[in-house]
Regions:
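Substrate/ligand-engaging "lid" and interaction regions
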Residues: 1-43, 47-528
Length: 528
């Protein structure tokens, strides 16, 4: 069993017998139609694209109600195209890993072309220019990570041949401008708040610079700023897509699926002819398009207005997912866990995050109306976090914790203040914040050192807790005032809102020698 069997029409009964779902549409007909009249180009050929946007389109094509595929362009790691797309005729296998242990296997055939988005690849770049000049093009989208929207001064000086993704996209938009000021929607699908604004500011920066340098007419800047022509909608995306997993690889090999190996590029991208991902997924997009759009609602995309996208993002980041992640990362590291799914079997940690979410954060949740916060958090706690197939680690989530606490917990505390709610009801959120001081010591609950995850403020914050020792007995905890009064870290001065002393008291318990983290966690979770 190989992906090439699909193109060759050499499909044995094994595919169906072993539970592989095959395309229900005419792959070659869709490819021909897309080549002639492309509607969607996606930048970023990584695992999340194949597991989510491409899979959504695959569902739309399977419905028989749509007839165009997606063209993928890679602007950073060109080996992905050479090694994970073109040898397999742009087909891939999506392995959906469910928390029940069930596995879904689907061949994704919605990607009709794969291109290297750089001038040095002459034919590919010429094809991208041709696509951008075609009136049929409706949307370009991105999964290039938040860093991909960066603008470097040196790149702005390169003129019309920039090397960064946003510069290349702006150059292609200039081709569309020259073809008749054709409309287009520029859609970020990356996991960052107000993502459309990040693309917008980058494109505007390049266009402004080029006008200033006399490389393009002022009308081009007006074109990318005209929302009847070019729009930059916001979106909220949520799906975990880890690198190819060895257990999945073994399972596919046992099935007789031969395209089961991992590919590691020179730029250290981990990819494969298959992609493994969790079952739960959300993609909510601001419905602001200037030239029509693919009907991705057929694959489960939720279209709404900008305010609703923002509310969904806040629901996720401030209440229903991210705060639980951070609580598990801080305490998971101190308790010696290396897998989030394993933490969910812990008799203290599971109720810890349940009570943080349902009892303490949910009273001030931002309800977007189109997604039920209780259903969302229920999926997180009961399906997503316990999923044994998701090799997510508390150590990964603990990265940059100082940059996350304000939005993940500070916003809830502010909401209690603004609504006049009784902050004495906050017990486990303060325990998370007390745990952060203990975490900064880099000593686990057995008294052994552990490696603290990278963080831009790590040295600075560790210096604050340096006088404290992880040991029983009296010590002066007054140094913690310098930590818990920092609004840049917590979003509020925790003393000013009446929580500083409570958190200090909890920290004293957590520092009381080996076993104190477990004992303190158990005490407060049980009491709550």
């Amino acid at each position: 069993m190989k992906l090439s069997d699909i193109k060759n029409g050499n499909l044995s009964a094994e595919w169906a017998e072993k539970g592989y779902e095959l395309p229900k549409f005419d792959v070659e007909a869709v490819k021909a139609k897309t080549h002639a009249e492309p509607t969607w180009v996606h930048f970023g050929a990584g695992n999340i694209f194949r597991a989510f946007p491409a899979a959504i389109l695959n569902e739309a094509l399977n419905s028989g109600k749509y007839d165009r595929g997606v063209i993928v362009a890679e602007s950073f790691d060109y080996e992905i195209i050479d090694k994970a797309y073109q040898p397999y005729d742009n087909l891939s296998l999506l392995v959906c890993l469910k928390s029940t242990g069930d596995i879904e296997k689907k061949v994704i055939a919605s990607v009709t072309e794969s291109l290297k988005a750089d001038y040095s690849f002459g034919e590919d770049w010429a094809r991208l220019v041709e696509i951008f000049q075609n009136p049929s093009l409706q949307m370009i989208s991105f999964t290039i990570t938040e860093k991909g929207y960066g603008v470097a001064p040196a790149d702005l000086e390169r003129g019309l041949t920039p090397v960064l993704a946003m510069g290349k996209v702006t150059a292609l938009l200039y081709e569309r401008f020259k073809a008749g000021k054709l409309p287009l929607t520029v859609q970020s699908m990356d996991n960052c708040s107000h993502n459309g604004d990040k693309v917008k500011s980058a494109v505007h920066a390049y266009a402004s610079k080029w006008v200033e340098q006399g490389l393009v007419p002022a009308e081009f800047l007006a074109y990318v700023q005209d929302e009847t022509k070019i729009t930059f909608p916001w979106s909220m995306i949520d799906k975990i897509t880890p690198r190819p997993d060895a257990k999945v690889q073994d399972m596919l090999a046992k099935d007789g699926f031969e395209d089961n190996y991992t590919i590691v590029t020179e730029k250290h991208t981990f990819t494969a002819p298959f992609v493994n991902a969790e079952e739960t997924q959300y993609l909510c997009i601001e419905d602001h398009y200037t030239n029509g759009r693919p009907p991705l609602e057929l694959g489960g995309v939720l279209y709404c207005d900008r305010e609703t996208v923002d509310k969904i993002e806040k629901m996720k980041v401030c209440t229903c997912l991210n705060p639980l992640h951070t609580a598990m990362s801080i305490y998971g590291c101190m308790l010696g866990y290396t897998l989030i799914s394993a933490e969910m079997a812990d008799e203290d940690l599971r109720p810890f995050i349940q009570k943080i979410g349902y009892i303490e954060a949910m009273p001030v949740v931002v309800d977007p109306g189109v997604l039920n916060p209780y259903e969302f958090i229920g999926a997180v706690i009961n399906r997503r976090l316990p999923n044994p197939f998701m090799p997510d680690a508390p150590q990964r989530i603990a990265t940059d914790t100082s940059q996350k606490l304000a939005i993940r917990f500070g916003e809830t505390i502010k909401a209690y203040e603004e609504r006049g709610l009784d902050k004495s009801n906050l017990v486990l959120i303060p325990l998370v914040l007390a745990g952060y001081a203990r975490y900064l010591k880099g000593i686990d609950d057995n008294g052994q050192p552990f490696e603290i995850s990278t963080d831009p403020l790590l040295a600075e914050l560790q210096a604050i807790v340096a006088p404290l020792k992880v040991e029983a007995g009296e010590q002066d905890f007054s140094c913690l005032k310098a930590l818990y009064s920092r609004t840049d870290v917590f979003g509020v001065d925790l003393y000013a809102v009446g929580l500083g002393e409570k958190i200090e008291s909890m920290a004293k318990e957590l520092f009381a020698g080996p076993g104190a983290v477990r004992a303190t966690l158990h005490k407060y979770v049980k009491a709550r």
